[in-house]
From Swiss-Prot:
GO terms for molecular function: DNA binding. Its main location: cytoplasm. This is Relaxosome protein TraY. Belongs to the TraY family. One of its GO terms (cellular component) is cytoplasm. Conjugative DNA transfer (CDT) is the unidirectional transfer of ssDNA plasmid from a donor to a recipient cell. It is the central mechanism by which antibiotic resistance and virulence factors are propagated in bacterial populations. Part of the relaxosome, which facilitates a site- and strand-specific cut in the origin of transfer by TraI, at the nic site. Relaxosome formation requires binding of IHF and TraY to the oriT region, which then facilitates binding of TraI. Also positively regulates tra gene expression. Part of the relaxosome, a complex composed of plasmid encoded TraI, TraM, TraY and host-encoded IHF bound to the F plasmid origin of transfer (oriT). Interacts with TraM, probably through its C-terminus. Keywords: Activator, Conjugation, Cytoplasm, DNA-binding, Plasmid, Transcription, Transcription regulation. It is found in: Cytoplasm.
Amino acid sequence: MKEPKSNIRKLIDIGGLIGR
């Protein structure tokens, strides 16, 4: 939780896989 940016990047990674 010390790196919120990592959370956003993970969401984008998952979203990209689902959006594919």
